[in-house]
UniProtKB/Swiss-Prot annotation:
Annotated residues for binding of ATP: K268
Name of this protein: Cysteine--tRNA ligase
GO biological process: cysteinyl-tRNA aminoacylation
Cofactor: how bound: Binds 1 zinc ion per subunit.
Organism name: Methanococcus maripaludis (strain DSM 14266 / JCM 13030 / NBRC 101832 / S2 / LL)
Gene name tied to this protein: cysS
Chief localization: cytoplasm
Positions occupied by motif 'KMSKS' region: 265-269
Amino acid sequence: MLKVYNTLTRCEEEFKTLNEKEVKMYVCGPTVYDNTHLGHGRTYVSFDIIRRYLEHMGYTVNLVINFTDIDDKIIKRAYEKEKDPKEISEQFIKVFLDDMATLKVKPADIYPKVTEHISEIIAFIEKLIEKGFAYKTEDGVYFEVKKFKNYGKLSNINLEDLVSGARIETSEKKKNQKDFALWKTAKPGEPKWESPFGSGRPGWHIECSAMSSKYLGEQFDIHGGGRDLSFPHHENEIAQSSAYSGKDWVNYWLHTGFVMVNGEKMSKSLGNFVTIGDISKEYSPEILRFFFIQRHYRSPIDYTAESMNHVKNNLEKIYNVIENIRISLEKSEKSRTWDENEFLLYDILKNSKNNFYNAMNSDFNTVKALKSVFEVSNGVNKYLSLTKTPSEGLLLKALDFYKIIGEIFGLFENYFKESSDSDEEEFVTFLIELRSDVRLQKNYEMSDKIRDGLKNLGYQIEDNPKEGTVFKKINI
């Protein structure tokens, strides 16, 4: 039974979808005015793994990730760069999508943009005014938070304790400084759209309510985002959407933890801002994904050079196990009689697989799930060290385990995809044989060139006095 931690109730709950075997999921996308950073990467990789696991468990997932392509930050950046706001937003939408592809994050089903949903947003605001939850002023339209009785439930904030101006813009036109903007009256030189409330543009929070309702309906299963969005953004979304429909809006609220850099919160002011573009030059996508799953998605994670080296070494160990299985399959036996070593590895595979699913069913606990992966790796290594002619069936079961792990965590994909490419391996074998010939002729310069060329193709070769030259895939 799958359980997920719901920020709204602050406890783990049994996961029940509105429609059988269908998950409607909305994850807040970026405000596209700058490069994608490590915090973005952590959030979207985390929800990618959640989505992959749900799909692995037989659910059809309809995922929506929005783009906030008009906002104060975008307008400010456009002014600084002397560019049109649309040019800025389109530039960084491309950066985001490219970075997500680099991180092997599966594309969302829908990427709605705010500027393409102005009519839906206006209609949403009109209904809130009609129902008495919003009011017009000279500088826009505001949601009256006192009218919504459950305001603050998600973030556990008491309305009376809110300090005016704390993450909520102040305005003399508001009835209450805790009210938030649904529509902002246009200022000179800013992008604007016509509406019944005058020329202007949407506030930040209303966009997600309008777009999620269009694509997922008035009620859906999962709403996700970074922990920093729980207030005011998600709190305001709940108020708007529930006031609009009169229904409970979202069943499960999931939030990812912060990314720290050397023990400090990542920020531009501290000079420790790490972009996906920069870090991808140093570490492969699989190392980054493996780094993110070292901590539970709700917990903070600390990015340090030491932690990344530790992650890289552990991932290499797993890849070595997978490669050793591939090599050992060549000398395995289909009809081998099992002895205690086979029974021991079989039990490890069976128990570890069960433990993996139990961990993932407990709010997608990747930390505990990884323990199962290392248990299998240790078991396989021990088995291969004790057995000269291993069981083919057992080795294939072990490979199948790693393939399942890879599909869910977004790892090993190139290995399993390419390992079936016999033409490539035949070519590599030919190059290794050619290298052996030139080594016999003592042409070590050419031998080294072939070795380096194979490394560039993703293969590491080892000269073993007993077994001759063997090759291994380099996947990270």
